A protein has these predicted regions:
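Conserved catalytic-core segment of nucleotide-activated headgroup transferases in glycan assembly
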Residues: 1-51
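Nucleotide-activated donor-binding/catalytic signature segment of Leloir-type glycosyltransferases, i.e.
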Residues: 47-64
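Short acidic alpha-helix that forms the nucleotide-activated donor recognition element
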Residues: 65-76, 97
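Short glycine/proline-enriched, acidic/aromatic patches that form the donor-sugar handling elements
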Residues: 69-70, 87-89, 107-113
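Acidic donor-binding loop of glycosyltransferase active sites
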Residues: 74-87
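Short hydrophobic beta-strand element within catalytic cores of glycosyltransferases
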Residues: 101-105
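A charged, aromatic-enriched C-terminal amphipathic alpha-helix characteristic of glycosyltransferases
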Residues: 124-127, 138-173
């Protein structure tokens, strides 16, 4: 079931990582200057990742707390599953629960259950991922369509439909 998290078409993308191995990051940052990339790690960041601060659309969060991570989910409308290595704190599922549009590379996916097939790209083609992001961010209907594809892929059931079905099964009684 989806949470009641809203997606506001904000041009904010979240990446949670344990390492500085983030597939296609520089290409994406350069090709999507209007998108803010919020990259968070539970630890210190390497000089390689810190060098990304030379881009105005990159914000880094080192030694991030669980509370800060929760806040980042609320501030972002996109999650990029493009980091190599282990998944941080079930990030993909948490992004799905917060109604973030999730995109990733085939080579870096951590939990494909929550990612629509059309939002998975080969790492040799970051331009396709960027193009799909631009399309989703171009309007409410485009984002809604992308999120619906994501929900269908995950066999998501909106809370309202779940409640209606439950009420009809219980004879319309309220508890």
């Amino acid at each position: 079931m989806t949470s009641s998290g809203a997606n506001y078409l904000r041009k904010d993308a979240l990446i949670l990582t344990h390492s500085d191995q983030i597939e296609g990051l520089e290409t994406l940052v350069q090709s999507l200057p209007q998108l803010v990339f919020r990259i968070a790690a539970l630890t210190e960041m390497s000089p390689k990742l810190l060098s990304m601060l030379s881009y105005k659309n990159v914000v880094l969060y080192q030694n991030v707390s669980l509370k800060q991570i929760e806040q980042l989910y609320l501030e972002s409308d996109i999650y990029l599953d493009i980091n190599h290595g282990g998944q941080v704190l079930q990030a993909v599922r948490k992004a799905f629960e917060n109604n973030l549009l999730i995109l990733g590379f085939e080579q870096t996916l951590h939990d494909r259950h929550y990612i629509a097939r059309e939002h998975i790209f080969d790492s040799s083609q970051p331009d396709q991922l960027a193009s799909t992001l631009e399309e989703a961010l171009s309007g409410v209907e485009q984002m809604r369509s992308a999120l619906q594809a994501q929900g269908r892929h995950a066999n998501d059931v909106p809370v309202s439909l779940y409640q209606e079905t439950l009420q009809s099964l219980l004879g319309g009684q309220h508890g």
